[in-house]
Amino acid sequence: MCIRDRNNSTTTTANISQKSLTASYTAENKVYDRNNTATVAGELSGVISGDQVSLSNASAVFSNKNVANNKTVTVSGLSISGTSSSNYALQNSIATTTANISPKSLIASFEASNKVYDRNTSAVVTHSINGVIDGDIISLENITANFSDKRAGNNKTVTVTSNISGADVSNYQLSNTTEL
């Protein structure tokens, strides 16, 4: 539509459409914590210098809670805010990236019992495991304990070996081998 005024100038109308923006994210690696939440940092592509537009309201989750490398992280609920945000349109409301969940370290504690000489090095130990997250199923197995030699004596070194087992074993690693 054209309109002329008395100065011989012409006016018309047209639209200014919102500029498209794309959000991309980088996820942080984490140690297993029994949940799938992820921490991410986002970046907008396409904002004109001097405009104030930022990403907001995003939540990020790993594909599941378990340990693995290059796990998919989905970022959803993306929106933009800021004084210039009405001039822009976010093209993606969901973004994906990858990150790692590494095993949580466990510490096994052992206490050796005294014994009477019996011509062998085998030892009896009591044990506990620290660091298992409530609700996960982990136990120590294949516990082997041996005195450094079979001779009678005080303050003898006992070497203990063991490994972990249970439904959640793939999310943990035993971080110590023990000499008592």
Label for each model-derived stretch:
Residues 4-180:
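Short loop/turn motifs that initiate or flank beta-strands
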